[in-house]
Amino acid sequence: MLPSLRKGCFIVNSIRLKLPRFYSLNAQPLGTDNTIENNTPTETNRLSKTSQKFWEKVSLNRDVEKGKIALQLDGRTIKTPLGNGIIVDNAKSLLAYLLKLEWSSLSSLSIKTHSLPLTSLVARCIDLQMTNEPGCDPQLVAKIGGNSDVIKNQLLRYLDTDTLLVFSPMNEFEGRLRNAQNELYIPIIKGMEEFLRNFSSESNIRLQILDADIHGLRGNQQSDIVKNAAKKYMSSLSPWDLAILEKTVLTTKSFICGVLLLENKKDTANLIPALKTDMDNIVRAATLETIFQVEKWGEVEDTHDVDKRDIRRKIHTAAIAAFKQ
């Protein structure tokens, strides 16, 4: 199943230190927010620019007839950067409560943009939904960084050298990192190949791995069959879920981690056993190399610890937004 992965072989740690991350051949760097700054007079834009608290009361307004819940400041519905109301379905009442809690917990002191991770992601989900409606103003699509097709093509590039497809050399960390990667990654890779077959007419879905002991320092690229299956999977997602996939992939540098998060927040009764996991294991999979670096060299204060908390926060935020009640 993994013809290029032989026992006892393991990607050079130094490869990933010298190169930020392997991407598909000739690809431009990813991982940045492509949303164009805009001056739409909304609460989220105002907070982003002033970093100051300007409200007294946070509340939820339930519209029973429409089955919607609006997040409000002083009786006015909070709007996204593109001017859409932060309104969710009644089925997402837990999400609405957590959004309210996020705003209620803010202090009166200077507010940092990362203080509202859940609101930021939900706003992205809502704006992506609205910009994918037929007849949407092209300028709004440009402000959010492109439509769903643009996002899908960007995310596909992460599959070429996915974090979970990059294997370290056997001589690093006395082979312990490679053994941990074999134990954690290989079952997930097999499960992912089986999962992608559901979105392809081809049965020979094989993910190309990047093994330092075999391939050395080079790029990596998935087959068209794999890419087409992955793109078909993304096409099956709602704009809301696509935004969550995007957030997870950008956080973990792993398309596979994005799929794991989304699929484990649905009904998992029919999910392939190898793909069943929890959020902490997704965080571990995405940061396995860093874990071993810290164990050997120690933690760099205000770097490793901050990065670890940041990744955990983003993964759990995405999980909350993806949760299906």
Curated annotation (Swiss-Prot):
Which UniProt keyword terms apply here? Answer: Chaperone, Mitochondrion, Transit peptide
Stated family? Belongs to the ATP12 family.
Q: What organism does the UniProt record list as the source?
A: Saccharomyces cerevisiae (strain ATCC 204508 / S288c) (Baker's yeast)
Q: What is this protein called?
A: Protein ATP12, mitochondrial
Q: What is the residue range of the signal peptide feature? A: none
What GO molecular function terms would the record report? protein domain specific binding
Function, in words: Essential for the assembly of the mitochondrial F1-F0 complex.
InterPro entries attached to this UniProt entry: ATP12_ATP_synth-F1-assembly, ATP12_ATP_synth-F1-assembly_N, ATP12_ortho_dom_sf
Location of the protein in the cell: Mitochondrion; Mitochondrion intermembrane space
Q: Which Gene3D superfamilies match?
A: ATP12 ATPase, ATP12-like
Q: Which domain of life is it from?
A: Eukaryota
Share an example GO biological-process annotation for this protein: mitochondrial proton-transporting ATP synthase complex assembly
Instruction: Write out the GO cellular component annotations.
Output: mitochondrial intermembrane space; mitochondrial matrix; mitochondrion
Tell me the subunit arrangement.
Exists either as a homo- or heterooligomer.
Other facts noted in the record for this chain: Present with 6370 molecules/cell in log phase SD medium.
Which residues does the annotated transit peptide occupy? 1-32
**Mainly localized where?**
mitochondrion
